[in-house]
Structures are given as C-alpha cells and as structure tokens.
C-alpha cells in the first residue's frame, strides 16, 4: 500500500465534522518566564479550516453546517481527535463539540 501524504487541502471532513487549526499558545509568561509543555493548558480556541456537508435528520434531509472556513471557534476541552499535519496541529471535531463562534 502506498503512503498518502496528508495535508490540509487533502483532508475533507465527513458528515457534521469540522477541522480546526489549534491556536498557538504563548511560549512565555508576561513576566518573561518560559513555560515547559507540561505547564501549558490545552488550548480550546482555533480557526475552522474545513467543514463537512452536514448531517441528515430522520427524514433524510441534509441539515447544513452553521460554521464555515475562517470562523474562530471555542470548543470543548477534551473533544475531538488531534491531528498533526506538517508543523501545525489540528483537531477534528463534531459540530456539537463547538461551543461558540468568537467574533
């Protein structure tokens, strides 16, 4: 089996899934102290990169997604599946795990 190179342009979420680029955290505090990875909290904010078509209701009608690429979102802390593509980190979430759009 040939290896497939994964990148953002080749990853299309299915159903009501959303691909979110995780926001980078500060490497040091306001006082100038560098933080080790173990001291950093898991981020809950990111930018929507790709969205699936939506999900179907009981009658089979497609319910479109409320999100679009470029939206900045707040999501549940332990939701989704983290994916590393190149040097960037992403999380693949269900739409229900997105708590709010940040404006």
Swiss-Prot record:
Q: Does the keyword Chaperone apply?
A: yes
Q: Mind telling me which GO cellular component terms the entry cites?
A: cytoplasm
Q: Where's it found, cell-wise?
A: Cytoplasm
TM ranges? none
What CDD domains does the entry give? cpn10
The domain of life for this entry's organism is: Bacteria
Keywords assigned by UniProt, alphabetized? Chaperone, Cytoplasm
The molecular function GO annotations come to:
ATP binding; metal ion binding; protein folding chaperone; protein-folding chaperone binding; unfolded protein binding
Would the keyword Cytoplasm turn up in this protein's UniProt record? yes
List the PANTHER family.
10 KDA HEAT SHOCK PROTEIN (PTHR10772), CO-CHAPERONIN GROES (PTHR10772:SF58)
General function of this protein: Together with the chaperonin GroEL, plays an essential role in assisting protein folding. The GroEL-GroES system forms a nano-cage that allows encapsulation of the non-native substrate proteins and provides a physical environment optimized to promote and accelerate protein folding. GroES binds to the apical surface of the GroEL ring, thereby capping the opening of the GroEL channel.
Per its record, how is this protein called by name? Co-chaperonin GroES
| Name of the gene this protein is made from | groES
